[in-house]
Amino acid sequence: MKDVKALKLMTLNDVLSQINGDMTLGIGTGSTMELLLPQMAQLIKERGYNITGVCTSNKIAFLAKELGIKICEINDVDHIDLAIDGADEVDPSLNIIKGGGGALFREKVIDEMASRFVVVVDETKIVQYLGETFKLPVEVDKFNWYHILRKIESYADIKVERRVNEDVAFITDNGNYILDCKLPKGIDPYKFHEYLIHLTGVFETGYFLDMADQVIVGTQEGVKILEK
C-alpha cells in the first residue's frame, strides 16, 4: 500500500503537463506544493519557459526563489493564468476546505484571480461533506477573537479552538489568528460562510466554494481526474 507522500507524488506529472510557455502561476501552500516546486523549477529550466509565480505564503515564496523560480507580488500582476494548490478536504461537488497551513486568505485571493484553478490531493482528502475529517479554519482579527469564537459556537453544535503552534498562538502572514471549527454533519457551507464573513473581525473563511476547475487525486489505483 502506498503512503500519503507516494500518492501525492503520483499526481505531479498531471499538474506539470498544464504548465507551458509564458504563464503567470499562482503557487499554493502546503506539503503537496513543496513536493511540486523542485519539479516545477526543473521543468521551467529545461524548457526555457518564461514563468512568473505569485505565491500564497512567505514560506512558499522563499522556497520558490531558492529554486530559481521568478516570483512577483500579487499587486504587480493583472491576471493569473493557472493556480495550483492542495486542499484539506474535497466534497463530491468539488467544494473544498483549505487553510491547514494558515494561508487561506492569500490562497483565496490568488485562486479566485486565476483563469483556471487546479487542486492536487491524495485520496484521504476526498470526503462526503465538508468538515467530515478536517476542521474549518477561519482567519480572524486578534483584537476580538474570543468574542468571534463565542458567536461561531452559538451558530450550531460547533467546537471552536484558537490554533496554537508549540503552545503559542499561531499568527498568519497577515498578522491574524486562526480559529479551527469542528463542524457537525448537516452544516450548509454556503449559509455558514455567509454568517461567518459578516461577523466583525472575520478576515476570511477556509471554504473555497464553486472555485475548483479540476481536482487531481492520487489513489491506490492510480491518478483520478475530477471535473465539474
Curated annotation (Swiss-Prot):
Query: Does the keyword field hold Isomerase?
Result: yes
* GO (cellular component) term, any one: cytosol
UniProt keywords, alphabetically: Isomerase
Q: Recorded GO terms, molecular function? A: ribose-5-phosphate isomerase activity
Enzyme Commission code(s) on record: 5.3.1.6
List the InterPro entries: NagB/RpiA_transferase-like, Ribose5P_isomerase_typA_subgr, Ribose5P_isomerase_type_A
Which of this chain's residues are annotated to bind substrate?
Answer: 29-32, 85-88, 98-101, 125
Q: Where is the active site?
A: 107
User: What metabolic or biological pathway is this protein involved in?
Assistant: Carbohydrate degradation; pentose phosphate pathway; D-ribose 5-phosphate from D-ribulose 5-phosphate (non-oxidative stage): step 1/1
Top-level taxon in the UniProt lineage? Bacteria
Q: Which Pfam families match?
A: Rib_5-P_isom_A (PF06026)
Q: Does the keyword Cell membrane apply?
A: no
Annotated catalysed reactions: aldehydo-D-ribose 5-phosphate = D-ribulose 5-phosphate
Set out the biological process GO terms recorded for this chain's protein: D-ribose metabolic process; pentose-phosphate shunt, non-oxidative branch
Job of this protein: Catalyzes the reversible conversion of ribose-5-phosphate to ribulose 5-phosphate.
Which NCBIfam families does the record associate with it? PRK00702.1, PRK13978.1, rpiA
Which family is annotated? Belongs to the ribose 5-phosphate isomerase family.
Q: What's the subunit arrangement here?
A: Homodimer.
Protein name stated in the entry = Ribose-5-phosphate isomerase A
The record lists the organism as Staphylococcus aureus (strain Mu50 / ATCC 700699)
Q: Output the lineage of the source organism.
A: Bacteria, Bacillati, Bacillota, Bacilli, Bacillales
Gene of this entry:
rpiA
